[in-house]
């Protein structure tokens, strides 16, 4: 009897193993249509998209082999954001939503269709109602968070501008991620001897006038991961440079393009993290059971040419630990 039970147990184990291997093979052989829905076009979000594709490829999901990508950009248009989300909910096996407004739209459009969503470049998933307090969600959504290292940025600004007292922050009033980050700056600024002077805008068209009012009353500007504001970085830099006021960026591409320095997020790496999450979902894990992940931090970057033009002396300690991204 014991021998019979051993044989039956062994046969059952072999059967289960065969079924698992068969399921894995079917998953590997299946072809997926993945939507990449991007809220706006600027380097941070572009890098997220590229990193996402790279992260999926590293996990074995390669464009042209077992993945077809449908990529659309809403150009910061809220109406178009809703349309893209609704279309992808009908056409895709999984949607990667880039930036908070797109993530919220994709969540609303995809949940009733049973299409999983993986978001990225969302600074406050809980505040945006995309995750519970424990980082999970009962529905098929997960993703990655690009919350800024606010205290590190304040420390950086203090090192670059020892005599500064007021930091200006432009933000879009309809972006929940921006409001969350602004509150963090307001909470921590006093500990570093700063006062935050905020200026809210509704659209990019408001940015120029807001800068005209803000710049005379601050020593510098620092950027959030605000999609509308960052999309108008060239306008911000033109006006700030004319006023002799430095702009501190929220990631490396902004520093390459004219901000003086940043302790911000490395978005290629964040996109890769998101691609790895998507691979888990495509492999059969329910998205809502995967807690969102946070950015793993990036290297401090500075632009020595911008600093020189603004007569800012970069401390040796900051030069030693950071990376100069000036175009030489």
For each feature predicted by the language model, list its residue ranges.
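Bacterial N-terminal signal peptides
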Residues: 10-20
């Amino acid at each position: 009897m014991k021998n019979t039970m051993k044989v039956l147990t062994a046969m059952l184990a072999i059967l289960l193993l065969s079924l698992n291997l068969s399921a894995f093979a079917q998953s590997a052989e299946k072809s997926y249509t993945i939507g990449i829905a991007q809220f706006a076009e600027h380097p941070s979000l572009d890098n997220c998209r590229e990193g996402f594709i790279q992260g999926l490829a590293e996990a074995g999901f390669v464009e042209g082999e077992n993945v077809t990508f449908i990529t659309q950009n809403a150009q910061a248009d809220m109406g178009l954001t809703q349309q893209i989300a609704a279309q992808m909910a009908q056409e895709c096996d999984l949607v990667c939503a880039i930036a908070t407004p797109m993530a919220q739209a994709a969540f609303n459009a995809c949940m009733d269709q049973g299409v999983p969503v993986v978001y990225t470049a969302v600074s406050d998933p809980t505040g945006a109602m995309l995750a519970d307090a424990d980082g999970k969600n009962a529905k098929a959504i997960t993703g990655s968070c690009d919350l800024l290292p606010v205290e590190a940025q304040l420390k950086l600004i203090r090192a670059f501008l020892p005599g500064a007292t007021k930091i200006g922050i432009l933000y879009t009033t309809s972006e929940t991620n921006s409001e969350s980050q602004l509150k963090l700056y307001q909470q921590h600024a006093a500990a570093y001897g700063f006062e935050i002077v905020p200026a809210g805008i509704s659209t990019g068209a408001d940015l120029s006038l807001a800068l005209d009012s803000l710049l005379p009353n601050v020593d510098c500007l620092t950027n959030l991961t605000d999609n509308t504001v960052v999309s108008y970085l060239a306008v911000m830099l033109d006006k700030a440079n004319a006023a002799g006021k430095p702009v501190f960026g929220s990631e490396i591409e902004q520093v390459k393009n004219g901000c003086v320095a940043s302790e911000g997020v490395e978005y290629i790496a964040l996109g890769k993290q998101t691609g790895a999450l998507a691979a888990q979902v495509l492999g059969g894990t329910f998205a809502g059971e995967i807690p969102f992940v946070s950015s793993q931090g990036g290297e401090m970057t500075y632009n020595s040419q911008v600093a020189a033009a603004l007569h800012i002396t970069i401390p040796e300690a900051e030069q030693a630990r950071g990376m100069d991204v000036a175009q030489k």
